Curated annotation (Swiss-Prot):
The gene is mrp. ATP binds at residues 115-122. SUPFAM superfamilies: Fe-S cluster assembly (FSCA) domain-like, P-loop containing nucleoside triphosphate hydrolases. Coiled coil: none annotated. GO terms for biological process: iron-sulfur cluster assembly. It comes from Haemophilus influenzae (strain ATCC 51907 / DSM 11121 / KW20 / Rd). This is Iron-sulfur cluster carrier protein. GO terms for cellular component: cytosol.
Amino acid sequence: MATYFSDNLTADQQNQVQQIIQQFQHPTLQKDLIVLNTLKKVEKGGDTLRIELQLPFAWNSGAEQLKQAVSDALLKATDCKLIKWAVAYQIATLKRANNQPAVKGVKNIIAVSSGKGGVGKSSVSVNLALALQAQGARVGILDADIYGPSIPHMLGAADQRPTSPDNQHITPIKAHGLSANSIGFLMNEDSATIWRGPMASSALSQLLNETLWDSLDYLVIDMPPGTGDIQLTLSQQIPVTGAVVVTTPQDIALLDAVKGISMFERVSVPVLGIVENMSMHICSECGHHEAIFGTGGAEKMAEKYNVKVLAQLPLHIRIREDLDAGNPTVVRVPENEISQAFLQLAEKVSTELYWQGSVIPSEILFKEVK
């Protein structure tokens, strides 16, 4: 659909506006914003220019960079003194692995996986979900780590219990704006889950499909660690749009991450990339950065297996303290270095999902966010 321009903008001014926005470059863009058809309306009223953008991925940070980069040129081109931006999101529904049917109320599912435990997969899942929300999307999180459900505690919601409006479906818990569900909400915090693989897989499938997800753009699933039968079964049963594999710089973790990539390839789930967690230790006293687990492993693995390094996240005591307190870093201190790293990760995950995927036009819904 062509961009609407108000009649008081000359043809030359209209062309200049499009050229200025078209020339904006960003690391997450594989096509320019005009080719993407994101510029919907440009209106001039007095000395004020109103610009409406509509984006198919969660991109608040990118939109802010766009505003800073092009505003002066746009004001000059249109003889205006003020720009009012309106950014809306029409998050694309993308093709699911193996053409599986959608989960009701969910556009896209992002599986966060690790080849082994202890690499910080759950902490990445929680902060990624919150960062996607901060980037403009409606987001939920499902704790599929059936034997060690930690998401309720990390979200500060361990004492909450879900309700059922009809004795058949579950209303998700709301925490920090996220819609969340976990087997941990249904049992005591100190109880052990002693289930065989098929029972665990069946329970998680129920949890996914019987939760009343509220028109989510993205559902982040915190997968169980490892690459065994449960993980393989879940990867086959869940209509995943794309997967993120979490690792650390240690050689043994990288070897297990390769197994995770291979597992998703085996079941035809696109791997968006790897997240190298604990990439750098940041001293809480002096801010010194030290690569205590080594360097370069993620880049070498990414090159060898043709995947992207989506982020290299720090090891910092604040991440652990904030999650223990149920107030994740991304919401507690959104402007600090750690939160910004997660926001960049969310931006890359959302855009990479879009570029790798195929849009399902009939399932796109419109949502005004600001």
